[in-house]
A protein has these predicted regions:
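Conserved acidic residues
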Residues: 17, 45-46, 82-85, 150, ...
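ATP/nucleoside-binding phosphotransfer catalytic cores, i.e., glycine-rich phosphate-binding loops
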Residues: 166, 217-232
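Active-site/ligand-binding loops adjacent to catalytic centers
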Residues: 16, 33, 40-44, 103-192, ...
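Short glycine/serine/threonine-rich phosphate/pyrophosphate-binding segments
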Residues: 1-7, 88-100, 121-122, 195-204, ...
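Gly/Ser-rich phosphate-binding catalytic loop and adjacent alpha/beta segment
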Residues: 1-38
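Active-site/ligand-binding-proximal alpha/beta "capping" segment
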Residues: 41-94, 98-99, 159-194
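Glycine-rich beta-alpha junction loops
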Residues: 52-55, 91-95, 115-120, 155-159, ...
């Protein structure tokens, strides 16, 4: 994890020991589970697990999904032929993928799950270490509705690392505008993209090429982190790969390889066999390691389970309003 991510955490805590620094890389989630298991032995601790907390899925289905749907509908008012072809999101906890459930149900969008090529758990039943921070934890989250996922895409951290230099340097931005003719306004926004944001962008491009989409097809994705979290990573890459400085020529090579060169490799259009293959991988984490009942694991294969939990948001809202009313802190209508 980058230096800036730890510094961000430090600003929000009172005691340094409140942050437990586990060993390993971005894909070493098992070590986090082990640390949480130790904490849970103290009955005063309560573990909130974003990988298995279904409210994470439901929240994105209700909030993120509605927000993205409104964006699509606003564009559709300008182009009645516009079709929502896909929703693209990298899988960390898999919570954000819940937004795709609403977009698929209401508009037929394909749900595209993304991971790091260096740790291709879904794509190739693979493993490894990578630097796309915030995603790709070498397991299948319990809250990932795998059997409703349509496409898997893997993106290399070499692409996200190097494009970070292009998007945040004057040399890179000048190349995009002057040599490629990109809009200065759009290029200026790219400086905000962190590693997983760029990962989603590249996966959207690969999806569009794989599905042979046209001008009336829309793909939506999310920029899930900012480049300010990776200044130290940028410095490290410059020192190791570009010791004489980053140039327009270097930017050209990176863009041609990783942005313009984004192709249909490392993409799988899922059928039922592929979906069940990925779903079954979760057994080892959740049943064997984490002690989830087999029946509770298996019921997630049925889409009726997901439709049921997606209807819980209004119930939770009522409970929140009731609680607020009883405390007197917030007056409810």
């Amino acid at each position: 994890m980058s230096k800036e991510r730890f510094e961000w955490l430090d600003r929000w805590i009172t005691h340094e020991e409140d942050v437990i620094r586990t060993t390993g890389s971005e894909s070493n989630v098992k070590e986090i589970y082990d640390a949480c298991a130790e904490l849970e032995k103290d009955e005063t601790n309560f573990i909130l697990n974003q990988f298995s907390e279904f409210a994470n899925h439901v929240g994105h289905h209700e909030v993120t999904g509605r927000a993205l749907e409104n964006i699509f509908l606003s564009y559709k008012e300008k182009n009645s032929n516009l079709r929502l072809a896909g929703f693209v999101a990298a899988s960390g906890s898999a919570g954000t993928l819940g937004a795709g459930e609403r977009l698929k149900e209401n508009h037929g969008a394909k749900i595209v799950a993304v991971e790091a090529l260096e740790c291709p758990t879904m794509l190739y039943n693979g493993f490894g270490e990578h630097n796309i921070q915030g995603i790709g934890d070498k397991h299948i989250p319990l809250i990932h509705n795998v059997t409703n996922t349509d496409v898997i895409v893997a993106i290399s951290d070499k692409a996200t690392d190097s494009l970070n230099l292009v998007f945040t340097s004057e040399e890179g931005k000048s190349f995009l505008v002057e040599e490629l003719g990109a809009s200065p306004e759009i290029v200026d926004q790219l400086r905000h993209f962190g590693f997983s944001s760029t990962c989603n962008l590249l996966a959207a491009i690969k999806t569009a090429k794989t599905l042979d989409l046209g001008p009336d097809d829309m793909i939506v994705t999310v920029a899930t982190d900012g480049s300010e979290l990776y200044e130290s990573e940028k410095t490290h890459l410059l020192e190791n790969e570009f010791p004489k400085g980053f140039s327009s020529e270097a930017a050209s090579l990176i863009v041609n390889e990783h942005l313009r060169g984004a192709d249909t490799s490392n993409v799988e259009l899922l059928d039922d066999v592929g979906r069940n293959r990925i779903f079954n991988l979760g057994y080892y984490t959740w049943v064997e390691q984490q002690g989830i009942e087999f029946s509770d694991f298996e019921i997630r294969r049925d889409q009726q389970f997901w439709k049921h939990i997606q209807k819980l948001a209004p119930v939770w809202d009522d409970l929140i309003n009731e609680f607020n009313s009883q405390t007197g802190l917030i007056k409810t209508k």
